[in-house]
Curated annotation (Swiss-Prot):
Protein name: Polyribonucleotide nucleotidyltransferase
Reactions this protein catalyses: RNA(n+1) + phosphate = RNA(n) + a ribonucleoside 5'-diphosphate
Annotated function: Involved in mRNA degradation. Catalyzes the phosphorolysis of single-stranded polyribonucleotides processively in the 3'- to 5'-direction.
Gene source species: Anaplasma marginale (strain St. Maries)
UniProt GO molecular function: 3'-5'-RNA exonuclease activity; magnesium ion binding; polyribonucleotide nucleotidyltransferase activity; RNA binding
Region (Disordered): 702-805
Biased composition (Polar residues): 709-721
Cofactor(s) needed by this chain: Mg(2+)
Ranges of residues in domain KH: 558-617
Major localization listed first in the record, in broad terms: cytoplasm
EC number: 2.7.7.8
Domain of life: Bacteria
Residue intervals of the S1 motif domain: 627-694
């Protein structure tokens, strides 16, 4: 029933298997590729285009279902929705790799679907998907003259060692994350993120990928020969030379004048007018009257003419469309801090390309939770690229971000990511939004420059400035020209889009797309060196505006501070059922994250709220010490004194003799429940705390100088009172026996008795004696804290199951 063709080879340290003839037999081409534990079903179907077009209507879709990793989708519907960004990026990798290899003039609709069947989280699915797509095309009968293969490349700088298809563990140690694709003779596509690698190291990675793909290309050829195509699609390119000659003789002057205009807007208007009249004339002559050509061939002839005109001008006159030299950068204008309430902003303008980049900082609770087939993770750096239609002067409805926006945003993300501080050094969640307000080529690289400037304006401590530049190529036979900072027309009519971003010390991102069937290593090497010169020039311009990140963040940025407490005190801070931490959050308006290692992260919109929350937490975790002053609340009144709740629920007794420096007839005459007081710890007997009010200024909390505590001075002015004395707990807590009986117990029972009103302190803060004599309460604005209490730490929250409140 099944006519199965199967070929395999040992590639790297894993077995690569290509098989067809069993699954999806009605597709023009269908293969299952297994590599290690990763398996992808790739299918190809084609049909004639419904409308005349001058491009290849190719659609590539990579799909990753959760069953590939043995999971059921989350959410209510338990079914996959729209493609994730990761799926979109892999789809683009496959598309950009195979598109240049189709013959010129072939405009049939082609749909390629790569379905991830199994994923071992070791073998990269993008590698398997591209090999599957190439193998499916090879047996489909669709004109695809040469096979292509791809591989993921890593690099360990310390060992000077490149890695073929690294695992996730190896990739975490690698300074390079590159995807390479190419044929036997040339490089077709490169996408990479690097930790400031040199041009030589990047070129070495491309060479390594090219060499290691050779055996896969041999395998695809062997497989295609064994399987054979089902039905060959006949494609014989129609000679459109006659139409091109007609255009050259009658319309060459109009196009030459249009392409001589250095202003993009007027140049576009002239070109549109020339094309409109030309298309109608050619269709009437060559389609309607003679019937010799189709509308699609007329469109292709116009594009061929324009392409040859511009390319000849560049190679013959050594001048580009806008009059620049090959290595000349457009005029650059830079401005930072231009959006008032943003956390940081920059406007980067290069010629007619402009990016308005704005940043926003958030707490770790704002991190994006990514639930993908690579595993769940939290992303703290977000970069979003938006390209509205007005950027190119078009009237079109705004739509959600498409593949292009996602791809350009990811490229800029890769360029900036290697220079960001660690979470321990800068725990904020960072979002960068690039609004492309004008575009004439290289908008993704303008985003890189603008993002670097905006982050420095925000106060994010970047390692270095990052700049990006897009390189182009015009190649005719053995003649070629590498162009720096290409504009839109040079991208449209050229042969290469080669984008390089990095710092003064090295490359952080590289992307190469070809429109011809690949290039040699000599052109890549020249492009890298010319891109380096341009990158350093742009960084010099950027450094004149802002060279280093600003000190600190703006006042309206969410405040974030950390403190470390004893792990045994975590339950005290949380409280029964979260009572204490909820009370802190509700009172101060902060958010609190507590990790199992004792790290407490506090997030708020203002510094005052953070300080108040810190003081409340310190009150809970601090231990009372003799000689320290605390704020507290009267929780219970007794005949012999008053019980005070302080330090988040600790109870102590202020004996009647320690309330005032004068005779008191009754405690209730001067104190009442819920009164806020300042108390000095004068004695601790196990869990029983003896307090004094009379030795402390009740307004400021300062210790009265003539009443500095001394163990020898244990009697107050009421020395004649039978219950006086300050040295022992029993003297303060016990009182006369008849008073103990009225209190419902003996032996200090009143101190142990709980009161419903003793759950919290009226105000936070503590004072050291004698170092802090005259020091105001931290709650009232002073940030000086010494002595006992939790140590403070700066940096990120703990990584052991944090709890959020």
């Amino acid at each position: 029933m099944f006519d199965i063709t199967r070929k395999c080879v040992e590639w790297g340290d894993r077995l690569l298997v290509i098989e067809s003839g069993k699954i999806a037999r009605q597709a023009d081409g269908a293969v299952v590729v297994d590599y290690g534990g990763t398996s992808v079903l790739s299918t190809v179907v084609s049909q004639k285009s419904k409308e005349p077009v001058d491009f290849l209507p190719l659609t590539v879709q990579f799909l990753a279902k959760s069953y590939a990793i043995g999971r059921i989708p989350g959410g209510f519907f338990k079914r996959e929705g729209k493609p994730s960004d990761r799926e979109t990026l892999i789809s683009r990798l496959v598309d950009r790799s195979i598109r240049p290899l189709f013959p010129t003039g072939f405009c049939d609709e082609i749909v390629i679907v790569c379905n991830l069947l199994s994923y071992d989280q070791v073998s990269p699915p993008e590698t398997v998907a591209l090999i599957g797509a190439a193998a499916a095309l090879a047996i489909s009968g669709i004109p695809f003259p040469t096979p292509i293969a791809g591989a993921k490349i890593g690099y360990i700088r310390e060992e000077e060692r490149y890695i073929l298809n690294p695992s996730a563990e190896e990739l975490a140690r690698s300074e390079l994350d590159m995807f390479y694709s190419g044929t036997k003779s040339s490089v077709v596509m490169v996408e990479s993120e690097a930790s400031e690698l040199s041009e030589e190291e990047m070129l070495g990675a491309v060479t390594f990928g090219h060499e290691n793909c050779a055996q896969v290309l041999d395998l695809i050829e062997e497989f295609a020969e064994a399987a054979g195509p089902k039905d060959v699609v006949e494609f014989v390119p129609h000679d459109i030379g006659k139409v091109v000659s007609d255009i050259s003789s009658g319309y060459s002057e109009k196009f030459s004048v249009a392409y001589s205009d250095h202003n993009k807007k007027t140049r576009v208007l002239q070109l549109d007018a020339a094309r409109e009249g030309l298309y109608s004339d050619l269709c009437r002559k060559h389609v309607e009257e003679s019937g010799e050509y189709t509308e699609q061939e007329v469109l292709l002839a116009i594009k061929t003419f324009e392409r040859s005109l511009v390319r000849a001008r560049v190679l013959d006159t050594l001048k580009r469309v806008d009059g620049r030299g090959f290595d000349q950068i457009r005029n650059i204008e830079i401005e930072v801090d231009l959006i008032p309430r943003s956390h940081g902003s920059a406007l980067f303008t290069r010629g007619d390309t402009q990016a308005l980049v704005i940043t926003a900082l958030g707490t770790p609770q704002d991190e994006q939770v990514v639930d993908g087939f690579d595993g769940d993770r939290r992303e703290r750096f977000l970069l979003h690229y938006n390209f509205p239609s007005y950027a190119v002067g078009e009237a079109a409805a705004l739509r959600p971000p498409g593949r292009r926006e996602i791809g350009h945003g990811k490229l800029a993300w890769r360029a900036i990511h290697p220079v960001l501080p660690t979470k321990a050094d800068f725990p904020y969640t960072i979002r960068v939004v690039s609004e492309i307000t004008e575009s004439d080529g290289s908008s993704s690289m303008a985003t890189v420059c603008g993002a670097s400037l905006a982050l420095m304006d925000t106060g994010v401590p970047l390692k270095s400035s990052v700049a990006g530049i897009a390189m182009g190529l015009i190649k005719e036979g053995d003649r070629y020209a590498v162009l720096s900072d290409i504009i839109g027309d040079e991208d449209y009519l050229g042969d290469m889009d080669f984008k390089v971003a990095g710092t003064k010390d090295g490359i952080t991102a590289l992307q190469m797309d070809m429109k011809i069937r690949g290039i040699g290593f000599d052109i890549i090497e020249k492009s890298l060196q010319q891109a380096k010169d341009g990158r350093l020039f742009i960084i010099g311009k950027m450094d004149k505006v802002i060279k280093e990140s600003r000190e600190g963040v703006r006042d309206h940025v969410p405040r974030m501070e950390s403190m470390i407490i004893d792990k045994n005190k975590i339950k005290n801070v949380i409280g029964t059922g979260g009572k204490n931490v909820r009370e802190i959050c509700e009172k101060t308006g902060v958010k609190i994250e507590i990790s199992q290692d004792g790290t407490v992260m506090i997030y708020a919109v203002s510094r005052d709220a953070v300080e108040e929350a810190k003081n409340m937490i310190m009150c809970i975790v601090s231990e009372p010490e003799v000689g320290k002053v605390f704020s507290g609340v009267i929780s219970e009144i007794a005949k012999y004194g008053a019980f005070v709740s302080f330090l988040g629920g600790r109870r102590g007794l202020v004996h009647i003799s320690e309330i005032k420096n004068e005779h008191i007839g009754s405690v209730s005459d001067v104190l009442a429940v819920d009164d806020k007081v300042k108390v000095l710890v004068i004695g601790i007997d196990k869990d029983h705390v003896q307090l004094s009010m009379r030795r402390v200024d009740q307004d400021s909390g300062d210790l009265l100088e003539h009443e500095s505590y001394s163990s020898s001075k244990k009697n107050g002015p009421q020395s004649g009172d039978a219950s006086g004395g300050a040295s022992g707990f029993r003297d303060y807590a016990s009182g006369p026996a008849r008073e103990r009986r009225r209190s419902g117990g003996s032996g200090g029972r009143p101190v142990r008795r709980r009161s419903a009103g003793s759950s919290g302190s009226g105000s936070g803060g503590y004072y050291s004696v004698p170092q802090h004599v005259g020091t105001p309460d931290p709650v009232n604005g002073n940030d000086r804290r010494r002595g006992s209490g939790p140590q403070h730490a700066s940096g990120g929250g703990g990584n052991k199951k944090p709890r959020f409140f």
